[in-house]
């Protein structure tokens, strides 16, 4: 039998291991350099790498493992790499949403994850562009056949992500949040 303390230690260990793997993927694959777009690349990386617990990524990886087990399949090295790719993309999308959420026109948050928000560290326009770049990088990465070999799987993932992020998903939820904050007299049906 496991005690609650043992389970928490195991969970924290898995979460930390997963976070390191996602950070490694992001560090290796997000753009970097000293050229024309160096500030943009730095801002993208600032809000993505070594930032946050990466719980969404953890859930992607662990769900993939679980689904393999219940379908009596082993997680191959290539399937695990696909899970890490998808998990990293979801973290990049989450970082993009947080960068935009912190902007003065939205929540105007000066800090995020224990450090200055992207727009505070850089400036508003760099933060907007860093978020936009993370968003497009996510779809570029999923569409790249070097990461996920099966073209139908890539198309399915892109569709599912776009639907979850779009006007009836995360972005629509942000709009509703903004409307609720400026119009506190919304009906229950509108909420």
Task: Give, region by region, the residue ranges found by the protein language model.
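Mg2+-dependent prenyl diphosphate-binding active-site environment of isoprenoid biosynthetic enzymes
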Residues: 30-191
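Intrinsic disorder/low-complexity segments enriched in polar/small residues
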Residues: 1-2, 74
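N-terminal amphipathic/basic leader segments beginning at the initiator methionine
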Residues: 2-30
